[in-house]
Amino acid sequence: MLSLFSSSPIKLRYAFQFSNSVPHSALRLCFPSTSSLHSHSQPQSLDEAVDSFTRMLSMRPPPSIIQFTKILGSLAKANHFPTAISLFQQLQARGIAPNLFTLNILINCCCGMRRMTLAFSAFAKIFRMGFQPDAVTLTTILKGLCLCGNVEKALHFHATVLAYGFHFDQVTYGTLINGLCKIGHTSAAIQVLRKIPQHGIVPNVVMYNPIIDSLCKVTLVSDAFHLYSEMLAKEISPNVITYNTLIYGLCLAGQLKEAILLLNDMILINITPDVYTYNTLIDGLCKEGKIKDAKSVLAVMARRGVKPDVVTYNSLMDGYCLVNQVNKAKYVFNTMAQSRESLDVQSYNIMINGFCKIKMVDEALNLFEEMRRKYLVPNTVTYNTLIDGLSKSKRISCALDLLVEMHERGQPTNVVTYNSLLDGMFNIKRVDKALMLFKEMKESGIDPDIYTYNILIDGLCKSGRLIDAIEIFQDLSDKGYGPNVRTYNIIINGFCKEGLFEEALTLLSKMEGNGCLPNAVTFETVIRALFEKDENDMAEKLLREMVARGLLN
């Protein structure tokens, strides 16, 4: 644990230039507390806790600060943050002095709410009251700085604390490394890991796991395995979390065979895979369409007595839908329902998407109604999937009804919602309505993306409104959106259809200069149009260029 040398508290206090006077009214927010602060039982309800605290305040003499701190801690643990702070203020107003544990709760509150100035003020109060901060205090400050993204300040705090005689323990370093990894500063976390032995601390699995996790999430799997090998060399035993993370990384990188081998390794060294291990592997296999292999893993899971959960079945359903075996997905869905396995919103979203993909929109709508009957609240993904399916089926009125329903139920719309509707409207030639919807979209604060602009430009070109399409294309560039190859292909095709070959060729020549390489579709569009107009020489020239670029097989 933390050890402290003689005069360091006073020096550290002034080294950070803490404020000596922050009004209690400024400390109005609380935090999710750590288990180390709250080992006592929680009050049964908020009202009971407040009543108990109020009765204790009115006692003469009042109970020990320990009793008050227990209630504050239990409130914080139950996420009743403002209430806990309000009661703390009442405690102070009655002149009842907090102890170190009470102040640790206050610091954790400020850190959890990212109010670091107030956290440091509470930290200063520890010194003013003659206490010495413990490992919980300093760990909490470090965690708070990391939560706020203040990596440099966190590392500076760590260095300064060491310089003034404080020694951190394994828990503190685990917290610091985890905090750095959570905000994407994996390199800084690795640096801390490398320096830990200099301070007499032996690295452990809790320090390695967050770094391995961060590396796997950005598919730096080889780097993650380097750390895994380092753990083994240092006789630091990996745990189920280590293996789960590595299996996830391998699946994310498409290295499914290696992921299965690692699962076998786990079992051989008597580390029991949990439901998360199997779910990760099943999901990875299903996403690659390897349903047979996924079912084999499911069989192993059953043999080893690990019960599949809703996530397991959702992955299987999604896998079947990806390979257009929607009936098999529905069989899994029905089996879940019959076995009283809790179907969630994601389960319905998967099936609704599967039916919409194969144009069975009415079946999707039936599931949507079933969700309501079961008091499951559809989310934005549910609505977007149905709106897209209806729009592709040219049932725009129904799709627009769902848009209205989203607004009425307070369900957020996004750019995907509007892109589906715009595409559907252009497909049935409701051009003016589409442009009105585009205006409504922007007025509601939703920024269009490149797909939105491609839908608009394509729809206008196909409706014979090339001039309007060109205006939007130019507006796209003026607003800093980078047209992609699809955007250029749409406009070039529009020019060719109107016989504007010079404009089409000019735009083709400008593409590369604008950072967008033409593809086979670009050349084929122009070449086909030139041949149709007997511009054979120019068409053959472009054909040779296409071959030279390796775009013709």
Where are these regions (language model features)?
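Short, conserved catalytic or interaction motifs in soluble domains
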Residues: 128, 185, 198, 233, ...
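C-terminal interaction modules of eukaryotic adaptor/scaffold proteins
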Residues: 511-553
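N-terminal targeting peptides
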Residues: 1-171, 180-191, 195-198, 202-206, ...
